[in-house]
Amino acid sequence: MNTNKRQILADTARRLFHQHGFAAVSVDRICREAAVSRPTFYKYFNGKSAIVQAVVVEQKNRVRAELEAVLAQCGTLESIADTFWRLQRESFAELYSAAFLRDMTDNTDLALERFFSELNEEKHVFLHGFFHTLQQRGLIRPDIPAELVGLFVRHADILAEQAQTLPRYSAEPQRLPQDILGLLLHGLAGEAV
């Protein structure tokens, strides 16, 4: 199997999903724009849901690798926060457009719903370990248990899906995760009361 064609399909899907969201993009369109046949598509992916998942996992793995690298470098909280901001901007520019985020919210595909839920849980486990390490290094306030930070992140995700929150961000859905990240990072860097 030619993994180059798989990557061409994934790159094309990422671009189209960013431009239009994944709901509006068909397998036919991905194949047409990638100049790859449908049988070739199905060698690598068993449908649109599978390529959505592959593209999201690829993005997640890249972000996680960079966060693990910055953690290994024992940087300052400021450099770590800068990395978070940069990765968030890159993710918005590469995949998580307003259209893509709306499709995630409006998704009715059970396989994708389960996938996004599992991905979210995996994110929380990773971030718990990440913030625990920062706390052990003295980079975030020692008086706040890492478990509380984890609960804050979980509740921030819930807040992001609340009907009361969504209208405020309907014109700029990417702004909500930015505001949540800003609140989290600036709150962690503050002095104890």
Task: Describe the function of each predicted region.
Residues 1-20, 24-33, 50:
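Basic, helix-initiating cap at the start of DNA-binding domains
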Residues 35-45:
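Short hydrophobic/aromatic patch on the recognition helix
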Residues 51-59:
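Alpha-helical DNA-contacting segments of helix-turn-helix folds
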Residues 89-128:
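Short secondary-structure transition hinges
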Residues 102-106, 135-181, 193:
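Hydrophobic/aromatic-rich alpha-helical bundle segments in the mid-to-C-terminal region
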